[in-house]
């Protein structure tokens, strides 16, 4: 699913919060099925990501239009996207804030990564067509595990 904002909430179990506009086709599917796959693309897919975000699944088949291929997920009915660096199978664990804030809380129940992608350059939406591309890693002292 295409979304422009998400946040890690917890690590054990992995919990993610995300905003999905109630105008989006995905919003109703997420409320009805209570599951999804968060697909994590790299910069090479940026044009397709914007295309998916600017169109509606009510009107077009995004997989066909943007030439994305799917694989079967193991825990949910939504498909994985083969071209993405990672796919996170999720189930909705809390939708109490969906009606007012479009905010869903998801538990990641299965994660997939492309092992051939050693240093993924993921993209992060800043709003209004602006993205940051991940790249440089810095390491600082930490007591976190």
Where are these regions (language model features)?
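Basic, polyanion-binding surface patches
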Residues: 1-145
């Amino acid at each position: 699913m295409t979304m422009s904002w998400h946040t890690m909430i917890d690590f054990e179990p992995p919990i993610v919060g995300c905003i999905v506009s109630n105008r989006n086709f995905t919003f109703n599917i997420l409320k009805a099925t209570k599951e999804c796959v968060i697909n994590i693309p790299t910069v090479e897919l940026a044009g397709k990501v914007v295309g998916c975000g600017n169109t509606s699944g009510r009107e077009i088949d995004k997989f066909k239009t943007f030439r994305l291929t799917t694989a079967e997920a193991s825990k949910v009915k939504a498909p994985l996207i083969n071209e993405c660096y990672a796919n996170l199978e999720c189930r909705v664990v809390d939708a109490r804030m969906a009606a007012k804030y479009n905010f869903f809380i998801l538990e990641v129940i299965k994660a997939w990564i492309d092992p051939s992608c050693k240093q993924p350059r993921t993209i992060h939406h800043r709003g209004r067509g602006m993205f940051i591309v991940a790249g440089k890693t810095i390491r600082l002292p930490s007591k976190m595990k």
